[in-house]
Amino acid sequence: MSNDTLHKYEALPEDHRNVALRPCLIEEFVGQTEVIKNLKVFIQSAYERREPMDHVLLYGPPGLGKTTLAHIIAKELKVNFRSTAGPLLSKAGDLAAILTNLQPMDVLFIDEIHRLNRNIEEVLYSAMEDYCLDIVVGEGCGARTLKIDIPAFTLIGATTRFGLISNPLRDRFGIPLHLEFYSVDELVLVIKRAAGVICTSIDDSGAREIASRSRGTPRIALRLFRRVRDFLEFERKHGTIDGNFANSALFRLGIDGAGFDKMDLKYLKFVFEAKGPVGIDTIASALSEDVGNIEETIEPYLIKTCFIQRTPRGRVLTQKGFEYLLSSKYI
């Protein structure tokens, strides 16, 4: 594999349209206050010592800024940024090719690091700790191990499934950072910053209307903002996005007052109709969705906002969830 795996992933950022809206510097990053405070210390210390920063593990629900933070760390350290993804690394040789092509102090970002297979993880162990690769050459009695030195680097791993990372790999990250859902006020700032970047007028009520339906997630906030902007340009050509206009556009997009879309509501209604604990496999079958997708994208916010509860016997609708479905006339 030369750098094909590396370049293949870099050509597919999580959302091309978000690239221009991403903050480039740590001072521009909105939210995750405690994480940012600590990162400033770690970045500045490593930069002043002219040493690679310790390896970083970013974990939390999708869309909270893990990839953006990885870019920012490299930018602040003034080093090259290289990226790939766990599913793209099928052989130990794929990872070895990337590591041997790094420059000193580079940042290597591995998205979905929980999807690395164990053989590749073992290659990472010596690379992370000793900046070397142990390569087995030959087979059987003639097999021998070659030790290849690689440049000192910083590995940044990102995952939405922290529990799926093996303990040996997890323990080799000196800086584990958990990203939390955003508050409405923080999402308002994210939306206003994006509006300024793409020269779209939006007032406080419009930004707050979108933010309140974004499930605590910047990626969703930016996606909804772009769609509301589309409606504005289609219907008025110019003007300001206010609360009423944003509400109307979001209604047309099928986003309700709590930020739930049709799939969220289908999930909640199914759990309600089950009249008791229901297993994730049963839910996935009923919704025709992958179990992993439900656990990664649908459930985290529903659990965070106490609409559903996980129990040893399955998922249960909470009183809050029941009252919401009832008051919104979904049941």
From Swiss-Prot:
Does the keyword section mention Ligase? no
Keywords of this entry: ATP-binding, Cytoplasm, DNA damage, DNA recombination, DNA repair, DNA-binding, Hydrolase, Nucleotide-binding
Any idea which positions bind Mg(2+)? T67
Q: Where in the cell is it found?
A: Cytoplasm
EC number annotated for this UniProt entry: 3.6.4.-
* Coiled-coil residue windows: none
Which residues are ATP-binding? Answer: L21, R22, G63, K66, T67, T68, E129, D130, Y131, R172, Y182, R219
Q: Annotated region Head domain (RuvB-H): where?
A: 257-331
Under the cellular component aspect of Gene Ontology, which terms does the record hold?
cytoplasm; Holliday junction resolvase complex
Q: What is one process in the GO biological process aspect for this record?
A: DNA recombination
Region annotated Large ATPase domain (RuvB-L), chain positions: 1-182
User: What are the protein's GO molecular function terms?
Assistant: ATP binding; ATP hydrolysis activity; four-way junction DNA binding; four-way junction helicase activity
Main location class: cytoplasm
Query: Per UniProt, where does DNA bind?
Result: R310, R315
Region described as Small ATPAse domain (RuvB-S): spans on this chain: 183-254
Its job: The RuvA-RuvB-RuvC complex processes Holliday junction (HJ) DNA during genetic recombination and DNA repair, while the RuvA-RuvB complex plays an important role in the rescue of blocked DNA replication forks via replication fork reversal (RFR). RuvA specifically binds to HJ cruciform DNA, conferring on it an open structure. The RuvB hexamer acts as an ATP-dependent pump, pulling dsDNA into and through the RuvAB complex. RuvB forms 2 homohexamers on either side of HJ DNA bound by 1 or 2 RuvA tetramers; 4 subunits per hexamer contact DNA at a time.
PANTHER family with a match to the protein in the record: HOLLIDAY JUNCTION BRANCH MIGRATION COMPLEX SUBUNIT RUVB, PTHR42848
Q: How does it assemble?
A: Homohexamer. Forms an RuvA(8)-RuvB(12)-Holliday junction (HJ) complex. HJ DNA is sandwiched between 2 RuvA tetramers; dsDNA enters through RuvA and exits via RuvB. An RuvB hexamer assembles on each DNA strand where it exits the tetramer. Each RuvB hexamer is contacted by two RuvA subunits (via domain III) on 2 adjacent RuvB subunits; this complex drives branch migration. In the full resolvosome a probable DNA-RuvA(4)-RuvB(12)-RuvC(2) complex forms which resolves the HJ.
**HAMAP family from the entry?**
DNA_HJ_migration_RuvB
Provide the domain comment: Has 3 domains, the large (RuvB-L) and small ATPase (RuvB-S) domains and the C-terminal head (RuvB-H) domain. The head domain binds DNA, while the ATPase domains jointly bind ATP, ADP or are empty depending on the state of the subunit in the translocation cycle. During a single DNA translocation step the structure of each domain remains the same, but their relative positions change.
The name this protein goes by in its record? Holliday junction branch migration complex subunit RuvB
- Name its species: Anaplasma marginale (strain Florida)
